[in-house]
Amino acid sequence: MQTNKHLHLWFPTMGLHALHQVEESISFWQWYIDFVDKIPSWLQLSRVLESAHLTIAHPEYFIGASIGQLALVAFIAFLCRKSEKATRIALGIYLIGLSFFLVWHILISYFTHSYSPVMVTCLIGVYLIPKWTYQVVKK
């Protein structure tokens, strides 16, 4: 059996996601509530403010959701482990989704003129995700 050359990318990608979730849990939600009035309407995602209030009131929900997200990704990685094509597709979708949220965090910080508490992982992601994407798309 030939080894799947893209399997090694799951761990750093999931590591960045996990680190981002930890960073987000520390104080991002309170920051979002404080600055939501400065975020342009086209950047406001539906139900994020509601989720922010829920997370402040019940942090265990956010912890559960974060663990659930990472468990789902690990399950998908497990299912795709024998197929390089499936791994490339799943990793590509995961990287696109992760990129969307990291760029969204950067944009809302830019438009509020405030440093949100998740910028460290966002900037790391902006550096690493193009490298990982290149490794996924090259043959």
Where are the regions a protein language model picked out?
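N-terminal signal-anchor transmembrane alpha helix
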Residues: 3-29
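Membrane-interfacial loop-to-transmembrane alpha-helix junctions, especially the N-terminal start
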Residues: 6-10, 86-94
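Aromatic-anchored segments of alpha-helical transmembrane domains
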Residues: 17-22, 96-106
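Perimembrane loop-to-helix junctions flanking transmembrane segments
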Residues: 34-52
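Interfacial helix-start motif at the membrane-water boundary
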Residues: 46-68
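Core segments of transmembrane alpha-helices
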Residues: 60-77, 100-101
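Juxtamembrane "helix-exit" motif on the non-cytosolic side of transmembrane helices
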Residues: 78-82, 103-112
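Alpha-helical transmembrane segments of multi-pass integral membrane proteins
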Residues: 106-139
